[in-house]
């Protein structure tokens, strides 16, 4: 599986909106599935079904 890069666009309650850097795709995902310390503007790598801070 290829690595994808996302930026946290906004956080509303317990959910985050992630914008993929290489396209206009946007994800709506629960904060519980993201690494501790994620905030608006954080850059995340998604690989092997796991998000990590870049």
Model-derived segments and their meaning:
Residues 1, 22-24:
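Glycine-centered tight beta-turn/hairpin loop motif at sheet-sheet or coil-to-beta transitions
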Residues 1-12:
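Structural detector for short beta-strands of small beta-barrel domains
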Residues 14-18:
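Short aromatic-glycine-enriched beta-strand elements
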Residues 24-36:
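Beta-strand/loop nucleic-acid-binding surfaces
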Residues 49-54:
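Short, Lys/Arg- and Gly-enriched loop/turn segments at beta-strand edges
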């Amino acid at each position: 599986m290829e690595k994808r890069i996302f930026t946290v666009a906004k956080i509303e309650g317990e959910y985050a909106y992630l914008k993929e850097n290489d396209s206009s795709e946007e994800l709506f995902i629960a904060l519980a599935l993201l690494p501790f310390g994620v905030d608006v503007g954080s850059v995340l790598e998604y690989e092997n079904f796991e998000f990590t801070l870049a």
